[in-house]
């Protein structure tokens, strides 16, 4: 009797332990505020797209989505902050240069581009353009190339970091022209300088050029993207202008940390696709100078790899100054 009671007690204790130790069902994501780190200043196309999606995603996620701008140094401080968080509730919303370009220009990075940044979903393709001062009185890229060839080393150019910089440097190489690069810590003065003729050419997002284009101060000659910009439909693509090798995309997208579970990545991508289906979002993104490009994590990863290979090929022939 005593033995049977002791046995029953032991079984009861063991059963209680098993129930207590059993893993609980995973909690639905997100459980708290989601942080979105952007490596650019407020108001530029990438930032505006990130903020638009952050605002819209707060509804299905039923949690606040807070955007933090950490600009400068080619996105390195922003990426470092993102990586150190090691958190499923922290996303990076960025241009692809932090993966495709930074490894080419920095001998050592405080993050591993391939391991620490996991593509979750692309959001938009921001149009990248080459524009010149209206004072040059050129009407096409061919006209500009002929002018630059006739004045080697006498014309100036500037470009915002990332793909615009590499794209313009590749144009110089492809066209066989020599120009002087002017570097700006903050690119906004460059827009004013090209509008007033102090520099002759710039490469940057189409969205930030539109006001100067509409004012007649600058002439947009080409977009690097595979398709024409809806805001400047008369402007040819790189391929149409005779430089297919200069085709680049200005992808903006969400990245997660390297151990982010697959189901969370899939959830973020699916919710982003739902946001992109709203006609008001389509219209707003177009007004920024971009087009929506929202797919799956695998599609985003493939697009990043394709762009990385193209940038590496360009980098073998040029050495632009950051």
Enumerate the predicted regions with their spans.
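Bacterial N-terminal signal peptides that target proteins for export
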Residues: 1-11
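N-terminal signal peptide c-region/cleavage motif recognized by signal peptidases
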Residues: 19-23
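N-terminal (or domain-start) structured segment
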Residues: 25-115, 152-154, 163-164, 176-201, ...
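An extracytoplasmic/periplasmic, membrane-proximal ligand-sensing/linker region
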Residues: 31-33, 174, 262-322
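Hinge/capping helix and adjacent helix->loop/strand transition within the periplasmic-binding protein
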Residues: 84-90, 104-189, 238-240, 251-284
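Short beta-strand and adjacent tight-turn residues that come in two discontinuous sequence segments
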Residues: 92-94, 122, 184, 203-205, ...
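A ligand-binding cleft/hinge motif common to bilobed small-molecule-binding domains
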Residues: 97-108, 165, 169-174, 201-235, ...
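C-terminal lobe and pocket-closing loops
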Residues: 209-277, 306-309
